[in-house]
Each structure stands twice: as C-alpha cells, then as structure tokens.
Amino acid sequence: MASFPSPPLAAAAAAAPPRLAPGLPLAAAAVRRPSSLARRSSIALAAPANPLRCIHRRAVSPRLRRRTEAVGAASAAIGSLGEEREGCLSCFPRGRRRGRPGLARFAPCALPHTYGLSSLHSGLTGAKIRRRHVLHAAGPDEPHVASPTWSETALDKHYVDQPIGKEELEGFLNTPLPSHPKLVRGQLKNGLRYLILPNKVPANRFEAHMEVHVGSIDEEEDEQGIAHMIEHVAFLGSKKREKLLGTGARSNAYTDFHHTVFHIHSPTKTKEYGEDLLPSVLDALNEIAFHPKFSSSRVEKERRAILSELQMMNTIEYRVDCQLLQHLHSENKLSERFPIGLEEQIHKWDPDKIRRFHERWYYPANATLYLVGEIDDIPRAIREIEAVFEHTLPEGEAAPMSTASPFGAMASLFAPKLPGGLAASLTGERSPAADKIKPVKRERQAIRPPVEHKWSLPGVAQDAKPPAIFQHELIQSFSINMFCKIPVNQVQTYKDLRSVLMKRIFLSALHFRINTRYKSSNPPFTSVELDHSDSGREGCTVTTLTVTAEPQNWRSAIKVAVHEVRRLKEFGVTMGEMTRYMDALIKDSEQLAMMIDSVPSVDNLDFIMESDALRHTVMDQLQGHESLLAVAETVTLEEVNTVGAEVLEFISDYGKPDAPLPAAIVACVPKKVHMDGVGETDFEIHPEEITDSIKAGLEEPIYPEPELEVPKELITRSELEDLKLQRKPSFASLSKEENVVKIFDDETGIAQRRLSNGISINYKITQNEARVGVMRLIVGGGRATEDSESKGSVIVGVRTLSEGGCVGNFSREQVELFCVNNLINCSLESNEEFIFMEFRFALRDNGMRAAFQLLHMVLEHNVWLEDAFDRATQLYLSYYRSIPKSLERSTAHKLMLAMLNHDERFVEPSPHSLQKLTLQSVKDAVMNQFVGDNMEVSIVGDFTEEEVESCVLDYLGTVSAPKSSKTQEHIEKISFLPFPSDLHFQQVYIKDTDERACAYIAGPAPNRWGFATEGNDLFNVIRSSSGDAQVSESANTDLTERKHNDVRSHSLFFGITLSLLAEIINSRLFTTVRDSMGLTYDVSFELNLFDKLDLGWYVIAVTSTPSKVHKAVDACKGVLRGLHSNKIVERELDRAKRTLLMKHEAETKTNAYWLGLLAHLQSSSVPRKEISCIKELTMLYESATIEDLYLAYEHLKVDESSLFACIGIAGAESGEETTDDELDMGLHGMGPIGGRGLSTMTRPTT
C-alpha cells in the first residue's frame, strides 16, 4: 500500500546513500530472500555468510520498517532462532513498503544517518541473519533477555554446578514463567479488552493500536477481500483521524488472515497548547473501528485503490508466496483466503454488503486496544478508555456484557465464541423479527485463526503428498521448500523456555556447519535456510527447509542440504558447540536486557500482540533474562541433541514408515534456463526426481563434526606491544595552523581526533544503549573511481574480500566464531562514493577491543582468495541476468542507463565488464582507496573516553596506512544525457501471464551541499541574486531578515530545503494521483543527494495498470511542475517541518543515527560538513520559509528537456521486447524471489 508521505528524517544511507540502481542489495541477490513467512526464527544455513558481510548498498524505502514476527514472548529470553525478516509474515504492516528493486528510495533528509547498521552481519547466524541492535527487538522471539548480573566467572563455569534431584527439577521446570510487571490488562463491560504498558522511548509519544479480530479467514465465499475493503473505507473515511494529522500524529492500517489493525503514533500533547491527545486518539480509533461511514463515494474511491494495489502486489514473489501457502495449508481456508481478495469480487460489492460484514465482526468484544508509550497516569488512561468506548455496543445488542476482572492469563484473550445467535448475521441481513429476539452476547472466537490443520507428527497415519512444482517464466532460480507443521508450543513455563533455548543452540550449529561449504568456488547451492517458528497468523508452528540453487545444480543442492541435516540429527552438536552458542546467547541476553528502557513502544506493542496471539507468557527483558539463566543451568548436551533431532526428523527420516510426513514439498522453478554453449532450453523436472534426490542425499555416508579452535584474540598483547614500539602511534594536530590535537564540542558531546597515520577519528559517548557501541569506517572513493576499463571492480572487490572472510592466519570460520563469542556484528559495504565497514559490539568482556582488533586485521592483514573472487563474480553475473525477469528492475535499469549517459558505475556491472576483471585488479581497486587521510572512523556508544582513545591508539594508530590519496584524480566525468534524445522517454515490456505496470520519472538535482552538475556552486547563485536585491534595500535591514540571509548561506541549506520539498511533493502526489484521480495505489517522490559527487537526482516511482500508467505519469509530472501554479502554503510547510523535526528528535536517541551525523565531519572530500550542521539542524528546519523552498525548487530540473521517464508494462501481450544492449535477455540466472507468505498481507493503507 502506498505510504502516506511521512518518511523518516534521516532514512537515507549515511554519508553516501544508495543510488537509483536497478537492484536489491547484493546480499539479496546472492542469498535468497528469507523464507517468507518472515518467521524471525529462521536460520540461514548457508547464505554466503562470513564475518565481513558485504552489501553493495542499494535501494531501501525510507518508509520501510522491519516488523518482526515470532516464536513468542518468553522465547524473547533467548532470541530468535534465526534472522529478522524484512517485513512481517506476509507483507508490510505498519508503514512498511516494499522497496522497489532498482530504485534508491530515501527519506527527505538533510543529514542521512545510516549506512545500514540494522543489517549488520551477526557472527552467530550468518550473512542473512540481521541481528539488529535491540532497540528494535521487542518482538516475541528476540533475544531480549540479558541481565546485567551475569558475571564472566559464571560464563566460564559448567552450566550445572551441583546435581539437582529429578523431582526438584521437574517441579521447577513446570513452574509458570513470571508475567510482565508493568503490563496492565483490563476489559470493559461491552467486552473490549485493553492493554497498557508505560514505555519511555520515544519520549513524549505513544502508540495506540486497535486490533479487530477479523481478517480474510473470516470471509465467506463471496466476500474474498471484504475485510481489506473495510480497513480502507473505515480508516481513510475517518474525519477524526484526519484532524490528528496536524498534531504530528502518524497513522496507518493493515489486514492479515487473522486480524485487522488500525494504529496511531501520536505525541502525548499538542505542541501549541499542551492539550492531552490521548482522548482524541481514542476517539479516532473508536470512529474507525466501530462507527465508520460507508458512503458510496468513499467505497468507490477505495475500490479503485484496492484494485490498483492488487495489481501492484501481483509480483512473481507474491505468486510464489501464494503457491507455498496453498500447498502448506491445502486442508483449510488459509490456502484460499488471501487478504488482498479476488478482483472479480472486489468489483461487485455495494456499500450495504460491506456494511453487513462490518456489523457481523466489528464489535467491542471482538477487539483489543493496545496503548504503549509515555503514559504516566494509568488510572486516568483507563478512565479515558472507558469514557470513549464504554457506550459502544454492537447493533441490536441492548444488554451489557458481564464485567470481567482484568485478565492476566493469556487464554482469557480467547474467550469461547457462543455458537448460537445472530443467525441473520450469517447472511448479513436483519430479520424483520430481529428486534423481538433477545440479544445474544457476541464474543471473539476461541481459536484464531479458526481453521483445522493436518499435523506433521510421528506415527500419524496419512498419505504422503508428492512434491508440488510451480513453474513460471519470471522465476530465475530453482528453490525447494520442505514444510513440517505442528501445533504451537505455548511458552508459559520454564520447561517451554528451556526447549526454545535448546532448539536455538542446535539450529545455530546447523547454520554454521553448512556454511563452511562455501569454501569451494562453485558450491551446488546458492543458499540453504532452516526456519523454525511460530505463526500467530496461521495458528501453527512451521519448520521449513529452503534450498535455492542455479537450475542446473538442483539435484546436488538438495543432496547437500538433506545430508547435512541428517548428519546433525544423527551425531548431534558437540560439547564445544553447545558451550560456544550457550555462552554467546547468555552474553547476548545480558547486553539486550541492559537496554530494557531503550525499546521503542511500537516494538514492545508488536511483541505483546503476537505473544498474545500465540498465548505465550509476556515477560519484560530482565524477567526473561533471569528465566534464561535459570533454565540454562539445567541444559545437558543429550537433551539439546534430543530436542534438536525432533525438529529435523521430517527431513532426516524422510521415507521411513514412522517419520513425520512433510506438510508439503514445493519446488518453484523456471520454465527455461540458459545453458552455456546451448542457449535457452526448457527446464524439465518431475516430482519423483525430487523425491529420489532427497533420498539419495540421505543415503550419503556421514561423519561426526570435528571441534574447531576459536581464537580468544586476533592480536596478542605481545604482538600489540611490538607494533606500538615500531609505529609509535600518537594523536596529531587537527589543524596546520594551530597545534590542536583534540576538539570537543560541549553542546553535542562530539570529540574529534586525528592519528599520526592520517586516520580521522570522531566519537560521541552516549547512554542511549547500555554498554553497546557502534563504529563505522568510511573510505572515500567507491564505485565512482571505476574507469571504463575497470567497471565493477570496486563492488566485486568488496564482495571478494567479504566472501573470503579471512584475516591474517585465521580462517573465515575462526573469525566468525570470534565475532560470535564477542557479540560483534560486522558488515563490509560499498556504494558510488564510499567503501565502509560497520561494527556493532558489546562493551562487556573487552568487546570493544575485540571489534577494534578485527578492524585492524582487515586493514593490515586482509586476505584475497581466488575462489572468493570467483564466487563474487558469479553472484553479480547471476544477478545481472535476472534483471530482465523483474518489471521494476528492468524499468529502473533502463532509466538509469539513459539518464546517466550509459554510465555503468550506477548500475550492476554487465557480463562483458565482469569478464575483464581479475583478482589483482579488484584488489587494487579497493585497497588503493585505503590510505590514511582518506579514512575516517566514527564511534558512538556507552564507553569512557579512556576506553575509546586507548583502542583507537592501539589498533588504528598502529595501522601502516599511506598518508596521501589520489582518489579524486581518478574519477571520470559523470554527466546527464543531453536533450534532445529518444532516451528521455522509454518503455519496457515484460512477458507475463498477468498484467502489471510501473513507471519511474527522474531528473537532476543538486547534491546535499549545494553543488550541481559541472561543479556549479549554487550558493554563488544565491549570493549573486541576494546581492542584487540588497543594492536597492535600506541600510536599516531588519535584523531578522539578516539572520535569515545567514540561514541561506548555511552549508546545509539545500539539504534542509530539499528535504522539506520532498515531504510536500510526496503529500501532493498521494492526494492527487492516488486519492483524487485514482490512478495508482503507490506513488512516491524520493531524493538522491550525494555528499562527495557534484550531482544528485530525484525519482518519482508509481505503480499502475497498463491502461492507466501513462495517465499516472502525466499526473505525476503535473504535480512536480505544479508548485508554481499551485503555491506551497504555510500549512504544508508546517506539517513537513513537524514531521521531520519529530523524527529527528526521536532518532537522536539511537546510536546509529549519531553515527550518521558524525560521518564526513573531518572528510576533505566533503568540506562543507562541519559541527554546525549537527548543532543547528533543528534551527535550520524551524527557520525555513516558503521562499527558501522555492529557491531550492528552482534547481530541481523538472522541465521536459531535463526529465527522464521509463514505463514498464508486463502482460501476455508484451509488445516489443527490450532491446537494451546492456541486457542479455536470453540469459536467466538467479534472482531473489522471496519465500512463503512474505507478500500476502495487505500493504499499509496509507
């Protein structure tokens, strides 16, 4: 769903955001997207995981919010069994939008703040496992259970110090887990249940979510999609919700199988008068959920929007997700009630039919209200809830429901639904005698979702289903999913928590083992993932083995995956593995529990909502940690292997009489494949071949796992002392004029240093995240330094270094386990302007020194391997070949090549360019940029000055970095294609079974610091025009006006004004193109502002239908060019300011944001970045005027001669095939297609 324009202030990538480039992050290209149900407990077994995880930073929607799903509240105590997905189980609840592959999508931001700390590599779970810092981790199965009381001594001891009696142990394990001490639950007389949780982050704001327990699973045969329709009509038709927008509140809604959620993120008080906003927010939710207006005009408007959304969602990824869900749940309605609905039915419903469905399901007893945030006076909040909702009764229900005591048990959320009553509601029509019948109380269903499953349990007699095969011309790679479906194990006792912990240990070992197979240059698989997680939306626990491979390698890939699963099942984990992963989990839990007061309200709320759906006990982080410590002491190696083996039996024992049968086996395969020397041939595969390959893999001989030596340090104390004697590290003067070796700014707390080898250092001490630090190395150059003979050398080089993952004499496996033991997340990335490394580390047990050791080893003792180069080259080759199979990526690719005059530095390298590269050439391209005065390191965290400066001197001061850089001299000219040209407007046609369309419109813009193409300094233009004006002015110029002229000369003037402009244009696009004209569901305006290069551009992205896409493009152009005829008004500017300032204020509570603010503070290639850009950011936003915005608007090139557009159309009648020479349309490689369920939930409504 199209996001309402309120993107985060600083959502662009830190100093150098990703550009409009047709592609997903390389990690996505190299590794299949997560096994779709977005189960956070999935384990990426063999993604190209390595300690130096590589990302060529690409397009990310600024509104893209990672919403996590869940194993359960109590299992938060030990963390997810795997990675965090991009998005929820099926799509994008709460503001999340699918980032368009191929387009860099950025929030309007003056100072971008993050290169991607949220996706840092976790040493524990591999490249695909993005264990984010737990500001985000309030989800039900996140590792939030750390305790500040777990000592190093305790970590070193055996987990069971003294024998414990069997009866005593059983008694302890059967004890219920403690409940969250601050969570308040209650129920009104009409059945509405509410939950209130005080939470301090973000300050002065709260979340209010109304969950109505009705979704697509409750629809009848002729109502498919009607729950989603009601979500739209009720939400967007609410006048009370609209009134809140002026207060700085944000709102949205989404629909899934089992529920519909309306949510508002609001300040606690109005800015102007300090009035309490809680009553207004509750009133708006009451109107939306229980008193919507089903006017014909609103229904028709939303019908158009939903039909557009349906076509937009209908990607190959969505179709694959549907296939997986259909086979997994073939025995129940989950296989056929996708939330978006059926197009033919959406066309038919009139307001009365929609209203009848609402009357049947939208009543207080079938809803739960969640309030999380700065709610200091809980009794008052309860009174406000009662005042707003107490009198809301379902139509025809006169008698109040009996009062229930506040419910503490999870099961009370699932009161049984009475079978009788309201027969008329089954048809949606009122009986004439309805008023004479005694009203019957309506309560929510006892089971959500109300479906029956066929379980994959040992000894359950049922016929095995043969593997299903889904073939499509838009699928590029082979993937197979083996599913096992069992009832949810509700985590309510210590025994339940202990089981989750043991599974986590077992599956972590499986990931690491299979990952070692990436040592070979040509592994048979692209990725192997094992996902084990609970799903509230499906009402079951699903284990999924997902294998992806190049089509020609599919048999070998299956054999390797099932063979490794059987080996672990038969031999189990070793004592060393159990100790290692247990220690890592305990350390992780300590770190995360320290952040108990830093978890955002929305994440806590999601955590509670999903936990309640699964009936897991909800604990806070400290309770969870204490519970984890208690059960950890009882875990034995034998039990870990027993519990883990049960998870894997459906694979390891496949074909045996008593083995649990897979719920489904589904292969998604291309119709045609490219064979070297042959060309395109049909891809043939049969179910029995799949079965034979599984059995063959299980029959391979197996051997136990050898123990691996894990280094405790990468640089010994004696080695360090020798280095210090040789290189004599010291801090040098920051200025040639003065002998100043340190600058400290009292207002921001930022310290600046410079080492004698030329490396610049910025750091800030914060308590945002207790005993956690983040660090970023930025190296100037990036892809811009590639010349015509070395296209792709930088990104392939960075990927090669990452693929190898070795440093010095340590293997990749040793380095990865070193990261596991020290809770270090690390990534290595590149974009057009920079190469950068990012670290996230815990400060306990010398974690910061360990992170600095790793950085030192990468800089001093990096290892370049031929097989890693081969893998990196193959990954980019495969990704390039997959572009023609994606409508969005093909369209974006063609636009980029045209706009930037076929400059390959801004798109994926072509096969021709890749063939020219060698290991030495890519190594030189990367390492030539790693010179002293071209490197800047920023560190933010909860450390002391002594700690950070000691690490800096010891490990960065001893780097033998050259002191001069000639990077600037090697940047070839970058220019926009001149007008006139046939390439200013293009079209792309993709053959597909279903129709879809999208378009991109782009044009030149200045960079963040006021430089335009050809190096023109726009501040000179401003000074020239203002100088002419001053000649005629009085000498008594108003002081305020003079101050404002100072604002216009501020180095961040264009960054600020363009950010505000983007907010306003986004809002107008939504209102005009989507809401008024009904031409699209999803339209957005994004700015791409470089820091170092003297250019930038804007992008409008719009999805539509083939019949409307040209009109949508014209409408977007009209909005873009209409700012002169339809002037910006103060109300629009105020709203844009409020949105960006509130997000800035909220983000300053995070380390990652500060890391971005520090970027380039001492960079000679970004001379206009200085401390005032950080100190005066708020003032600059507040001071901006409409006239300032028009000054910036004059330098957005929106005329016909500067504007580029490309329309992409997919359908059976594909028109002319794309003839772009850069794309080899006949080659089909691997492309990420997502996984089960990722795209089936509806987009957020706005």
UniProtKB/Swiss-Prot annotation:
UniProt EC number: 3.4.24.-
Active site per database record: 231, 302
Cofactor(s) recorded in Swiss-Prot or TrEMBL: Zn(2+)
Binding site residues for Zn(2+): 228, 232, 309
A cellular component term, taken from the record's GO annotations: chloroplast stroma
Details of cofactor binding: Binds 1 zinc ion per subunit.
Keyword Hydrolase: yes
GO molecular function: metal ion binding; metallopeptidase activity; mRNA binding
Chief location bin: plastid
Subcellular location: Plastid, Chloroplast stroma
Enzyme class, broadest EC rank: hydrolase
Pfam family, one: Peptidase_M16
Alphabetical GO biological process terms: embryo development ending in seed dormancy; proteolysis
UniProt keyword terms in alphabetical order: Chloroplast, Hydrolase, Metal-binding, Metalloprotease, Plastid, Protease, Transit peptide, Zinc
InterPro entries (alphabetical): Metalloenz_LuxS/M16, Pept_M16_N, Peptidase_M16, Peptidase_M16_C
Transit peptide start-stop: 1-136
Family statement drawn from the similarity comment of this UniProt entry: Belongs to the peptidase M16 family.
General function of this protein: Cleaves presequences (transit peptides) from chloroplastic protein precursors. Initially recognizes a precursor by binding to the C-terminus of its transit peptide and then removes the transit peptide in a single endoproteolytic step. In a next step, pursues the cleavage of transit peptide to a subfragment form.
Protein name: Stromal processing peptidase, chloroplastic
Gene that encodes it: SPP
